[in-house]
Amino acid sequence: MSIIVISGCATGIGAATRKVLEAAGHQIVGIDIRDAEVIADLSTAEGRKQAIADVLAKCSKGMDGLVLCAGLGPQTKVLGNVVSVNYFGATELMDAFLPALKKGHQPAAVVISSVASAHLAFDKNPLALALEAGEEAKARAIVEHAGEQGGNLAYAGSKNALTVAVRKRAAAWGEAGVRLNTIAPGATETPLLQAGLQDPRYGESIAKFVPPMGRRAEPSEMASVIAFLMSPAASYVHGAQIVIDGGIDAVMRPTQF
């Protein structure tokens, strides 16, 4: 039985992924603020440190997979928490867990980015540059003082920087024998999306943002792709970002890919 660690396992895509992987016979070690084997607040350095210690204690012989789903949206009240969870809550965990993954059987990791990751250019984004430099306090300050666009900046900027972080790790992880990929979901029927729809700042634009397929995704549709990426069937998929958005990115950026 393989051991797979999932952050953000209590709701949304993380919960759907847990269901699919457990049904396939995998043992799950979940991380979340509730309803998980490891209870942790990834918005703080202390919470991330404790999460890492608790997971490694449960996976002393190694782990076979890692799925990083924990994330916050643009409507989050404390915008600094968006960049802390979305970026540091993923990069610090993936780096800390690489040695354990190297001990696993056909190990693989999937990080949840977003179709919004393509909305900003990394080299022209002060937030992304601060995140890459590990300057958490500076990154939090940037979004908290960004005015009306702070939420969108925090979300898209953190996902942009996260995708770059994964791609820049592809060489080292490949040499270590651990596959690492991201998925970029579009609008998915999760509590995170519902919170956005109910926010007067974002609700109307989200509601009007309908993919060419005419509907939003279900979490299970993300989970099935994650399960594939974690499986031996994806043995040569590495360093990739898989866009699962019902065609939105193709419509918005047909010549950019």
UniProtKB/Swiss-Prot annotation:
Which reaction(s) does the protein catalyse, per the Swiss-Prot or TrEMBL entry?
A: a 3alpha-hydroxysteroid + NADP(+) = a 3-oxosteroid + NADPH + H(+); a 3alpha-hydroxysteroid + NAD(+) = a 3-oxosteroid + NADH + H(+)
**At the top level of its lineage, which domain of life is listed?**
Bacteria
Record localization: Cytoplasm
Keyword vocabulary terms for this entry: Cytoplasm, NAD, Nucleotide-binding, Oxidoreductase
Q: Which residues of the sequence carry a binding annotation for NAD(+)?
A: G8, C9, A10, T11, G12, I13, D32, D41, L42, G71, Y155, K159
EC top class, in one word? Answer: oxidoreductase
Listed binding positions for substrate are: S114
Under the heading InterPro entries, the entry gives: NAD(P)-bd_dom_sf, SDR_fam
For this chain, one GO molecular function annotation is: nucleotide binding
Is Transcription regulation there in the keyword field? no
* GO cellular component terms given for this protein: cytoplasm
Q: What induces it?
A: By steroids. Derepression of gene transcription occurs by binding of the steroid inducer molecule to a repressor protein.
Chief subcellular location: cytoplasm
EC number(s) on record? 1.1.1.50
Could you share any additional remarks the record makes about this protein? This protein is thought to initiate prokaryotic steroid catabolism.
Please explain the role this protein plays, according to its UniProt record: Catalyzes the reversible interconversion of hydroxy and oxo groups at position 3 of the steroid nucleus. Along with the 3 alpha-hydroxysteroid dehydrogenase and 3-oxo-reductase activities towards a variety of cis or trans fused A/B ring steroids, it also reduces several xenobiotic carbonyl compounds, including a metyrapone-based class of insecticides, to the respective alcohol metabolites. No detectable activity on testosterone, progesterone or 3-oxo-desogestrel.
Q: Which family does it belong to?
A: Belongs to the short-chain dehydrogenases/reductases (SDR) family.
Q: Summarize subunit and interaction data from the UniProt record for this chain.
A: Homodimer.
Q: What is this protein called?
A: 3-alpha-hydroxysteroid dehydrogenase/carbonyl reductase
Gene assigned in the entry:
hsdA
